[in-house]
């Protein structure tokens, strides 16, 4: 039962990020300092680690995406 709930929550997270990528991000243009972009990172993190750890990794990544952090490659960690 918990696995089904986790899958449903992961689907909601990925759907929200995909909505952002399709409808909101184009209004602002590319602004992420990292490769992959923060939204692509979020989708990969949730798909790879599940909604809770993937969501946490995404929040940590978003907190680093500002002008005081150097640009670069920041892949999703392996399990």
UniProtKB/Swiss-Prot annotation:
Could be involved in insertion of integral membrane proteins into the membrane. It is a peripheral membrane protein. Pfam families: YidD. HAMAP family: UPF0161_YidD. InterPro entries: Membr_insert_effic_factor_YidD. This is Putative membrane protein insertion efficiency factor. PANTHER family: MEMBRANE PROTEIN INSERTION EFFICIENCY FACTOR-RELATED (PTHR33383:SF1). It comes from Prochlorococcus marinus (strain NATL2A). GO terms for cellular component: plasma membrane. Its main location: membrane. It is found in: Cell inner membrane. Belongs to the UPF0161 family. Keywords: Cell inner membrane, Cell membrane, Membrane.
């Amino acid at each position: 039962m918990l696995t089904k709930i986790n899958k449903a929550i992961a689907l909601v997270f990925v759907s929200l990020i995909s909505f952002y990528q399709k409808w909101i991000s184009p209004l602002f243009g590319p602004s992420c300092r990292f490769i992959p972009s923060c939204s692509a990172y979020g989708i990969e993190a949730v798909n790879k680690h599940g909604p809770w750890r993937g969501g946490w990794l995404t929040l940590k990544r978003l907190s680093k995406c500002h002008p005081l952090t150097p640009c670069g490659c920041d892949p999703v960690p392996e399990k």
